[in-house]
Amino acid sequence: MPRQIRKWTCHKLECFTDFIEAYARILENAECCYLGLYSGSGNCACKDTDCNMDDSELRALKTRFNRYIFVARNQPDAESLKRLTEPYKTDNNVKIITGNCIREEVIHRLFDLVPRSASSFVFIDPPGYRGMRWATIKKIIAHGSDWKGHRIDLLIIFPLEMALLRNLTRPECEASITRLYGNRKWLEIKQARLDGKIGLSEVRHQLVELFKVGLKDLGYKHVESIEPTQFANPPFYHPILASDSATGIKILKDAWSKPRYLPCELLYKKETSH
């Protein structure tokens, strides 16, 4: 069954398409694997417009990575994804794993399928902040270097959902937010909010920046985020790219900063890959 989404998610997918097409072009002949965590069924339906569209998995498959590995959340999603990805398969280049990304054994299965000679790109788009843990990010980075020591590139859709903002000041939610960040430094943001020293906009900014600091502390040369062009105000997420190359940062900003129409809108025009 297609995943039900809102128009802001459609906007996110259009931005992702521009990003992943441009990113794949800079690979040229380099061997690189695409790893999709928290993968869904492969297609989605917009609640606002009742139109169907490809999800991120099929959009990525239209680019030129050497291998694609998707971690589906459950068996129905895995079966749907297997059916929809079949036309794109060449030389056994698509693999689908079923499991929870927070489990060590799932991460091991994922990287067992990645050749040591290949670099990797990981797309992390969790179904809410409770689904993402800092420990998982660290495991991915630890497993993800190629034989030359090149660190894995990460594109993280950081969830700035209302649930995170509401739960920030709830004692019973401290454990889940601490798992997201891997530390308790976020409590300083919480206290500043409770003391009335910062508003909601600054809370959002500091939550994103704190996550970026953690990625920088893991050794990445470039960690950047961008607030999506005003489609949802405030935005429900921030894309964050962690890479040792500055090229990907420019691609991120180009993809998410430009105004755009959606497929359901009259002036929409699909850009073709160069």
Regions found by a protein language model. Name each.
Residues 170, 176-177, 246-273:
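Flexible, glycine-/basic-rich loop-and-beta segments that form/coincide
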Residues 104-115, 138-141:
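Short amphipathic alpha-helix with an adjacent loop that forms part of the alpha/beta core around
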Residues 165-231:
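A conserved mid-domain beta-alpha-beta active-site/ligand-binding segment of alpha/beta enzyme cores
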